[in-house]
Amino acid sequence: EYQETPSPKEDLEKIPMLARSDMKKEAAPFYNTELSVKGIPVVHHDIYSNGIIYLTMLFDIAHVPAEDIPYLGVLKAVLGYVDTKNYSYADFANEVNIHTGGISSTIGVYPSVKDKDDYQVKFEVRTKALYDKLPEAATLMKEMLFTSNIDDEKRLYEIIAELKSRLQVSISSAGHSVASTRAMTYFSKAAAYKDTITFYETLCDLEAHFDERREALA
């Protein structure tokens, strides 16, 4: 009832409003500095971040065959959720929460503004942490990337089954977005990396035939 009650005009007039003159015409500048650290290209963004460092590692995956693209989604789901050399996956999650604001992985697709068929695709691993926690964050990222036990078939099945269930709910609640992305795959190669339907079909197949596929998957 409170929300449905109209606000008096005098109260509405108290709400701060922006005039067109308050808005800047100039686009915000980029603060990008390209560096090379031990032969690795680095882009540094020198902007105020309230003492928090945002770190993203990018790995080129343009060489991955089209039929293997859905497995990148499986890899993304597995990293951080399996045991590593020094931690169980539960203990690893605790360490991540203690020292960082999270570690995640995703697939980044960067289309060209000039050519719809020209794009770059990267496998990205991200974290954010306070500056004095950067060594711990980097160590945990290294632990996850290089020592994750992706041969744990029982855990792999659990992750695949859970991911399939979550994706099923997501498709049901956002079918229009899923259909839109699928339609884009017919004229945009870059859209294939975001195709939820193909990924879901792959998960269904992996879950149904896990015993036959588990060794190849790992």
Each PLM stretch: what is its role?
Residues E1-E67, T202-A218:
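Proteolytic maturation boundary segments
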Residues N50-V82, N86-E215:
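M16 family metallopeptidases and their MPP-like homologs
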